[in-house]
Amino acid sequence: TNISSTIELDGDHYVINGEKWWASGVGHPNCKFLIFMGVSNPDSPKHQRQSQIIVPYDSPGIKLKRYLTVYGADHAPHGHGHLEFKNVRVPKENIILGEGRGFEIAQGRLGPGRIHHCMRIIGLAERALELLCKRSLNRKAFGKPLAELGGNYDVIANCRIDLEMARLS
């Protein structure tokens, strides 16, 4: 709800000003449209101030400022970008579901996305724990497998506990 970008009605068009961070796929040659979220109703209740609108990527006033890295990985040109919008005019028919519905739309998408990413990360953590257990049985130090040296049981047990807590939260 803390958005400073604006979407203002001007006749038969909306005028967009602001920036969009983490615009996925903006460098891909097939990227032709963007979904922009900005404040359209500043005097409305907090969760009804924003709207979302479809913006043709080739609209005058859109500038790709830079590509963004994720955890140090550069996914350019197909990854995420930082875009600037200056007086971008879009037909009013491009508004999605009507003015003031942007937050609602965003929440409808973010909820399932969060669940997806949690499941994916828990799966990766399970695999990492499996590899840790195998290594503790196969890697020898001081003539014994690491698992028999005692100090590794609590590490493995704590990993299992953390994983189960993540699964339940």
Q: What do these predicted regions represent?
A:
Residues 63-165:
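Glycine-rich beta->alpha junctions and the first turn(s) of the following alpha-helix
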